Amino acid sequence: MRKIGKFIWAFLAVLAVFLCTGLATLGSVQSTGDSMTYVSGKTVMYKFSGGKKQLGSVYVNVGTIYEKIGDRVSIEIEYSSQSSPSTSGGTDLVPAYYMSNVYSSAGKNGLNYNWQEVTSGKSVSTEYLYFKASANLQLCEIVALDKDGEVIPMTPYTGSKDFTQEERAKTLDAQAAFNVEQVKAANTYFTFTQEEGLSMTAIHTLSAKSYQGCVYNLDGNFGVLSTLFMAGSVAIFGQSVFALRLAPFIASAIALVFLFLLCKDLFKSEKYAFFTALLFALGGVGLTVGRVGAPYAMVAAAILGSAYFTHRFFSKGISSKTPLKSGANLLFSGAFAAVAIAMETLSIVPVAAILVLFGFGVARIYKAEKLALEKLGVGKEEEGQELDETQKKAIAGVKAEYGYKKRVAFSFGGLAFVALTLFTFLAVGAICYKPLVLVYDNVGTHSMSFLSLIFTNALDSAKTSGLTAYTVENTASVFSWLLPLKTTYVYTAHTGTQYLAFGLSMNMGLAFLSLVALLFTTIRVAYGFVKKTADKAELRLRRIYFILLSAMAATMIAAGVKGMPTLLSATVFSAAFAAFVPLAAMSQESCACEKCKKIADVILYASAAVAAVFFALSLPVYYGFAVSHGYESVFIWTTFLRS
């Protein structure tokens, strides 16, 4: 059994820290429980337990709103003190409260699935409470507080004919979990961001019932498969912040593993693979993307998985002894590629770059066949040399062997990258047929075919359509990804004493080092071409250089084509960009002298130290925790130009 090297143990330690700190700070598992479907024009009525109470404020938690993203909805809270109250309404407690579906041009923070104080500043003595809204929506929870801020126990009013007793009880099943201090504090631990409000809305659409006059929404930035993946953990843990962020976070850890394995294969070194994974973990982008309840990290993990298995095929080829087993690399690669494209259609751009690597792998098989035949004398008969029977049999055997290898490569490649992609789209379309009809067609009169629904959803994810208030503000040229010129914020909040800015930015120190390493290796590779150096180390350096450069270019093109690119789409880019630092270090080992090896180690360890320092300085942004006013200067470490 092969001994596990120290750098593999070091990577496992980094992965363990990544998982433990991430899971511990991911978010609360508190859920608002079940929800009821509120129909516009009706009234939800409650009665305070124990008679009249001095009502101080009312908080509501509204989930999915069946209107277009960005539309405004009014919420009215009324009260009554009569012994025989009207079941259709009472006296307005305060003027109507307005909230927008997912986002508002007036505010950046998400409202859906978060607690909102809809009345305050007016204390009345009352016994009955009414809820009304101007749109159909999911009412998750409603809480009434007395003038001292204590929860007032209440029950559904039995005299009301609107909605059943069981339906109204669902809006009171998490009263004990309400904490007004948590609601008012600036935090991401208990709060859904706008991106996450959109994700929760899409998840709810998967199981939504059809109601007249409702508008149903999916996350327009991604295919419905990504919503299915996140729906699993929400089904297990409930409508909580932790549940929504769990799938993307696990995906970010998987991406870290695939990056390590890919670089171990690329560099032929556990040391360089470890430092690449470490720099990616400290880089900021991969960490934060995995902590946002949106599919970005899942797409990145699928692309890295596809790249890893394709490179295994490229480097190892098809084995003569176990051709089907080695060909399975292509099946795994195609499966991950299919998942990536089904989650985000423009993943087809990086997948196309991966297919180029597949083409080079096939070319290697042809080249190996040619060399094997030349060794047996093929071509010499043209010089007047006859081949004996033994040579002819050997040649026939080589042709049969490599013919089988080529058939395995092409059949597995075609099955993986074409058939699996088509199957994935069709399977997801069949599973999610009803929600696709709700979003894109008319339930009563079907006008779109099954394939049209799938195609429309795929086109949706190829453009920026699921906008939030942060989308435009976070937009920057893909070339700005080379340096942290602009921090991408997904949630900001401030109270009288605290300020919070949760976002992602390429680690400033690492970004500068990566850019220098990119320029250095570019000059180094160009110098090798000029000098016509062609030794084994030089060829490996060039191969790694062009693979990393292709990964960066492919993700930049995909984001640019989609429009409004942000760092949320730069996970694969940041991994490839950070890998140039180990590549620059490896280039110093080409002469194989002890001094050069020491220089390479200095580059690696010094770069890791610099990245760790800037990572520590940027913790409030990466992990999304608040700092006291007066300490906002910590955010200057996240960007060169502005924060």
Task: Describe each PLM feature range.
Residues 306-331, 340, 362-369:
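Membrane-interface transmembrane helices that cradle and orient dolichyl/undecaprenyl
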Residues 276-281, 337, 341:
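Short helix- or helix-capping micro-motifs
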Residues 248, 285-298, 345-346:
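Short acidic/glycine- and proline-prone juxtamembrane loop motifs at membrane-interface regions
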Residues 258, 298-321, 336-337, 573-577:
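Specific aromatic-rich, kink-prone transmembrane helix
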Residues 242, 246-267, 305, 517-524:
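Transmembrane-helix motifs of polytopic, lipid-linked glycan transferases
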Residues 2-45, 184-187, 356, 362-366, ...:
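Transmembrane helical bundles and short interhelical boundary loops of multi-pass, membrane-embedded
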Residues 220-228, 237-254, 500-511:
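Loop-to-helix entry region of an early transmembrane alpha helix in multi-pass inner-membrane enzymes
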Residues 184-195, 207-227, 466-472:
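Membrane-proximal lumenal/periplasmic loop motifs of glycosylation machinery
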